[in-house]
Amino acid sequence: MDFGALPPEINSGRMYCGPGSGPMLAAAAAWDGVAVELGLAATGYASVIAELTGAPWVGAASLSMVAAATPYVAWLSQAAARAEQAGMQAAAAAAAYEAAFVMTVPPPVITANRVLVMTLIATNFFGQNSAAIAVAEAQYAEMWAQDAVAMYGYAAASASASRLIPFAAPPKTTNSAGVVAQVAAVAAMPGLLQRLSSAASVSWSNPNDWWLVRLLGSITPTERTTIVRLLGQSYFATGMAQFFASIAQQLTFGPGGTTAGSGGAWYPTPQFAGLGASRAVSASLARANKIGALSVPPSWVKTTALTESPVAHAVSANPTVGSSHGPHGLLRGLPLGSRITRRSGAFAHRYGFRHSVVARPPSAG
């Protein structure tokens, strides 16, 4: 634009009627804030990547992450530099406006000059105001030139401040093929839902035939893991219980596996029912009985009558069997012959007697 062709009223009016340098200063502050944020983000990304790839995370996944994140970190750093430059340019534009504003003639001064010239011309009846009119016109020409110079300088400075390096687009850190795969998956959903609904509508002959299908379908993966863990714990607990029970049996019952206590058998079975039913064991000193020259326990002859005749103490030819219902001695007493002797009168076994043998007659063949 040719600012020299415009009168000072227009140039000065444009400079004074606008909002001033306030918006440009606000823009400069905003760009500075953006630059700081981008710089912090780039520094944070670089620090985290260096910390992860330093020791804890290595391998193909780490290399893939670094390859995808490094260009983005570089873009953040570049964007921070561009934002800082934009802030500086906005501040430069505000400074150029301030300089042009100072150089521009205020509109009231121009208006006063124009009023003075018109007044001098109106009252110049005899030419007495010609010199004053020339001076006022010269001042107006200076205002014109001053505004033109200010506007030309402001246009050049603002044009230089408005030259910004465009921001580059951020690099792609994702796979564009994923969008195609997602579209294909979404397109396949109606058919999948239709197949699921048709499978759910299948009629079963017996409702109890598909209880397992409903049960498994209602169990979530987390619940399945919990069920498997509980089953494992129950089997483990059962094995441990059997192990400790076998140890307790060996310690309590002995190698045979069964031992009767004071109250009877540990297991209520017929073969152990009589265990522990005898009287408590007792012992005495110098109280043994005599059978001939043999010392025997008192229980051996406890049931033998002491008033029997000497013949009754002989060993009977038909020994009696001790009753199992009698007192529980060690050998259940000795067989007695006195009772048999009483039934047979004075008969008794005689030892050392020589029997007479009758020979077989020849007539017997």
Curated annotation (Swiss-Prot):
Q: Which InterPro entries match?
A: PPE_C, PPE_dom, PPE_sf
Per UniProt, what is one Pfam family of this protein?
Answer: PPE-SVP
UniProt-listed GO biological process terms: phosphate ion transmembrane transport; response to host immune response
Q: From which domain of life does this come?
A: Bacteria
Q: What happens when the gene is disrupted?
A: Mutants with simultaneous deletion of PPE25/PE18/PPE26/PPE27/PE19 genes have a slight growth defect at 100 mM phosphate in defined media, and at 30 mM phosphate, growth is severely impaired. Knockdown of PE32 or PPE65 in PPE25/PE18/PPE26/PPE27/PE19 deletion mutants result in a severely impaired growth in phosphate-limiting media.
User: Any signal peptide, and if so, which residues?
Assistant: none
**Belongs to which family?**
Belongs to the mycobacterial PPE family.
Q: What is this protein called?
A: Uncharacterized PPE family protein PPE25
UniProt organism field: Mycobacterium tuberculosis (strain ATCC 25618 / H37Rv)
The encoding gene: PPE25
